[in-house]
């Protein structure tokens, strides 16, 4: 009696040996989204901040799975990377953009996937950031032959749109420096730290980590944590007289911290109070990222640690419009598009331009 399986296996082997063609690999069992996502993240050089962003996306995918189960009755549904196409991407986009409504309609979504923060309406800027991460994952899957086709072919990526960056003028900073905070010593300390940040331009995470030993030959030296795994480049920012005077003022602070920092959340709240107390409360124009409409808001109400970084970049870029030169002081990648938003003509230059027309009348 012929053993059919063995006979078949031997003859299949003979066929591929004779033809010179490689024998197809045996298909492996279905790999879950989470397993693939873990592998994707393990192969990426991501800082802690970027990792957190990708983990937010993972949780969104899990909630999308629950949404499909609830809305379509597909109780066994799971997000199968191999089956994702443009149509599914459109559905995923709709879910993430309108998730705040879907979790109200289907409470089971959050029961199965508890989320600490409230889910709010999301605009195109947010969606653009999320889908850049989705695309990066599928690009990795395609390059590693996990999927046969790239699902983003024909998919229209959302566009980012930002208003002009809002930052303090040098006169504003001077007013803050001269403001009297003698009645609130804690606020005075935070004022000094904010002014220091306006003069060195580092991100809040790097600011909080600065140590006394990071001041070398009259300059602050640090490696930005946001890009340390992708581009471990030391940023060197010479300290001007204002920054140096603040370092000198707090040189006897116990421990190795450069300045007496507090938590970033309290720091941001204090910055708003600092501007208000200094009288920096004029209105500025902001763009609502959800409705894409502009609105006015007092500058102190939108002030934060990132405004200090924008103040550093904006005021230097007005004088030296060389992105590569400025990026050497900020830690941006060379050729970064982040500086495109700072190319607005200064208001004083605009006044000079329109004065040209006065001679025509």
Predicted regions and their residues:
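Catalytic-site neighborhood detector that most strongly recognizes the C-terminal catalytic loop/helix
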Residues: 224-228, 264-267, 330-356
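N-terminal core-binding DNA-recognition domain of tyrosine recombinases/integrases
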Residues: 38-49, 58-164, 179-182
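Short, charged phosphate-coordinating catalytic segments
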Residues: 139-149, 197-219
